[in-house]
Amino acid sequence: MVERIVAAGRGVLVEHGYDAFSTNRVATAAGISPGSLYQYFPDKAAILDVVIDRYWEEVAERVAAALSERIADFGPGMVRDTADALLSALEADRELLRVVAEELPIHRSRERRAALERRVRELAATYLAARRESTRRPDPATAAWVVVLAVENLAMRWVLDQPAAVTRDALLDEMVALVGGYLLA
């Protein structure tokens, strides 16, 4: 029943947005009574928390897996593949990303997004520390922070804005140039 409610909550959030998200709508979408919903979740905030937690967890898993699979690689191909994995993870549910990034009050997803950034940043810092000879940046943790936030923000804006002048391949090329230029400067 919990899975059904969470799936319905995700659907309601995407279809109606944050402002119209309610336990009654979620219960209707789940095909249960509001009373049944309250047996599992005390309020709409609890449902939102699970939906948002799972969303960022899904994104984190995809990106961490892509980075882990390429940990032995170095150079433009690795950057491109990892950025491509991030784009794919964000595109997997573009509409939920839109609601999470643009409609939810910042406090609702800040901690979860920060956890994703921290996880990827730690992997990137470890990766850069193991390849100090391949970069001119003195501190792997600082370099990882800059690279992860730059790539993440570019990816999110591209997925949400879908700029006609910037194709996916063009964006990936620019990300590779940005990261490569920064790490080698």
Predicted regions and their residues:
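Alpha-helical DNA-contacting segments of helix-turn-helix folds
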Residues: 48-55, 116
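Hydrophobic/aromatic-rich alpha-helical bundle segments in the mid-to-C-terminal region
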Residues: 98, 102, 110, 114, ...
